[in-house]
Amino acid sequence: MHNTAVILAAGLGTRMKSSRPKVLHHIAGRPMLAHLLAACKTAFAATVVVTGPDMDEVARAAAPHPTVIQRERLGTAHAALAAADHFGAGAVTLVYGDNPLVTGPTLQRLGARLGAGDAALVLLGTRPPEPGAFGRIIGPAGFAERIVEFADATEAERAVGLCNVGGFSAAAADMRRWLGNIGNDNAKGEYYLTDLVAVARAEGASVAVVEAPWDECRGVNSRAELAAAEAAMQSRLRAAALAAGVTMTAPETVFLAADTALAADVTIEPHVVFGPGVTVGPDVTIRAFSHLEGCAISAGAIIGPYARLRPGSDIGAGAHVGNFVELKAARLGAGAKANHLTYLGDAEIGPRANIGAGTITCNYDGFAKHRTTIGADAFIGSDVALVAPVSVGDRAIIAAGSVITDPVAADALALARGRQVEKPGRAAELRMTKGKR
């Protein structure tokens, strides 16, 4: 049957103190909304996102999924009802856009519990280490009779550890009806999604509870909670990498993106940061204090320490990128080496080429970027400036200190620096002259 997820993403997130919509704040290199969309993709046939007025950025981030606008912010139930035309004929699951850590398997469990047939409504619950002001789920094991807000709870109810964190599944027809029956007789005059339980129970419906780990159910309403969610996501990503055969000598200092792809037998030293779009092949070593984003690293390469790989970098098998070396939109061929203090931008470096310390590809003329091509087995001496567009042929040698502006043929030696001049005795004369003053 066609099942649909509805992500409620219309909130302003005022406690974030940001001009950016809350669901577009990043965790592990991608917006919170993107994490939810990825989880929903594994559990539902369709996903729709509810946004608010003037939230075009959220609609663009949700594409190609459809969006609907909650014209007035009158509460979470009102937001869900705005998407009623998208519920379809199967089951529908409502999730909050600021719960980015929930996983696809947990969402699948909600649907499976609904499919068991002994409950018409299923909600997601968790047991936080500090339940605090969360609403408590009251009922026999596995079921809910009501949700009691903390302010209204008795001491006995406050002692209950099972808390409501959002996430509701029901048949589409039931969900439409129950949402329409929720009232706004409360201090704020809003329509609250948590009242679904009371409305369903008033019809005699049974309400089941699916429990999920706390680290999947963290809400993000402030910068502090965003940092806590980031820490939880990083722990999850590190654990998955370690289980897949990656070595991290100090895992707590390594920061991964949600899409970081690490092969088995990769070794990562402390204080390495992965931005989005990094793929690392087997037997690669990434040394300490390196920063990588938007790059591909082939088997057996060695990166760092203190290396920076920027978007478009492609490191060949067995290549070396050493300390204080930066690459951007550059391919380093198999076995090539750039071991010290080098910038290679918009460049193609052939296999086994050796790039000396202090080499710079001068790729920007103030108006446009230009490419540098260095052939296989070429040797670039230290402190060389390659003024693009320029090419260096296979097996060519560039003398240290050269400024290369013209093509260098294969097997050629190129020197482009002033000739050294020596004046015997002149140093002694200068000392005498300076000393008399």
Curated annotation (Swiss-Prot):
Cofactor note: Binds 1 Mg(2+) ion per subunit.
Function: Catalyzes the last two sequential reactions in the de novo biosynthetic pathway for UDP-N-acetylglucosamine (UDP-GlcNAc). The C-terminal domain catalyzes the transfer of acetyl group from acetyl coenzyme A to glucosamine-1-phosphate (GlcN-1-P) to produce N-acetylglucosamine-1-phosphate (GlcNAc-1-P), which is converted into UDP-GlcNAc by the transfer of uridine 5-monophosphate (from uridine 5-triphosphate), a reaction catalyzed by the N-terminal domain.
Signal peptide: none
Binding site for UDP-N-acetyl-alpha-D-glucosamine: 8-11, 22, 70, 75-76, 96-98, 135, 149, 164, 221, 310, 328, 343, 354
One protein family per Pfam: NTP_transf_3
Protein name (database record): Bifunctional protein GlmU
Gene Ontology CC entries for this record: cytoplasm; membrane
Gene3D superfamilies linked to this entry: Hexapeptide repeat proteins, Spore Coat Polysaccharide Biosynthesis Protein SpsA, Chain A
Places the protein is found: Cytoplasm
Molecular-function annotations in GO: glucosamine-1-phosphate N-acetyltransferase activity; magnesium ion binding; UDP-N-acetylglucosamine diphosphorylase activity
Pathway: Nucleotide-sugar biosynthesis; UDP-N-acetyl-alpha-D-glucosamine biosynthesis; N-acetyl-alpha-D-glucosamine 1-phosphate from alpha-D-glucosamine 6-phosphate (route II): step 2/2; Nucleotide-sugar biosynthesis; UDP-N-acetyl-alpha-D-glucosamine biosynthesis; UDP-N-acetyl-alpha-D-glucosamine from N-acetyl-alpha-D-glucosamine 1-phosphate: step 1/1; Bacterial outer membrane biogenesis; LPS lipid A biosynthesis
Active site: H340 (proton acceptor)
Chain positions covered by the region annotation Pyrophosphorylase: 1-223
Family: In the N-terminal section; belongs to the N-acetylglucosamine-1-phosphate uridyltransferase family.
Residue ranges of the region described as Linker: 224-244
Record field: catalytic activity: alpha-D-glucosamine 1-phosphate + acetyl-CoA = N-acetyl-alpha-D-glucosamine 1-phosphate + CoA + H(+); N-acetyl-alpha-D-glucosamine 1-phosphate + UTP + H(+) = UDP-N-acetyl-alpha-D-glucosamine + diphosphate
List of residues binding acetyl-CoA: A357, N363, Y364, S382, A400, R417
Gene it is expressed from: glmU
Quaternary data: Homotrimer.
Lineage of producing organism: Bacteria, Pseudomonadati, Pseudomonadota, Alphaproteobacteria, Acetobacterales
